[in-house]
Amino acid sequence: SNTFEIPDIQLLVQSIRNKSQRIGTEIIIVFDNTWAGPLYFRPLEHGMDIEIQAATKYVVGHSDAMLGLVACTEKTYKDVKNSCRYQGISAGPDTCYLGLRGLRTMALRMSSQFDNAMEVAHWLEKQDIIQEVLYPPLKSSSSYNNWRKSFTGGGSLMSIVLHKEYSDHELAKMLDHMELFAMGYSWGGF
């Protein structure tokens, strides 16, 4: 979400497991881990059943391949595998190559991106025009304590809340005159 709210992961998983027992039906927990990537949060280690992520972002790292990842528990593996097979979901060899290429530098890139994101977030917090920076690793974030309990780092994506509401014209003017940043697809890729 653009608000980057992180719940108490342990409480959420336990609540879902309790509900599953009460209703007598197994509830499968699926977690989109695109923001934190595979380095900063491991959903399966926190009791989730299936992890999905857009590998186009951090894994590939160059916005030059469309790739998604699914990791799952042994319990859900057969169903996930069959779903992918029956829907014809698979990646081509060149796309896999680009993903493997990106893995070589992913840790270095994500570490640098996290450090840079923290620096930018701290700078944004000091700007008069900004009411709030929505980035869980910030101590000022309402999600900070939950982030700190479960995550070991953070993604490079954040949002801001402005003090004033601006017109579409004013926002377009601001975006059109940016020199360091630009609007882009795939989290600012090409």
Locate each region found by the language model.
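Conserved C-terminal alpha-helix-loop-beta "cap" of PLP-dependent enzymes
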Residues: 132-190
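Conserved PLP-enzyme active-site core in the AAT-like
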Residues: 1-129, 134
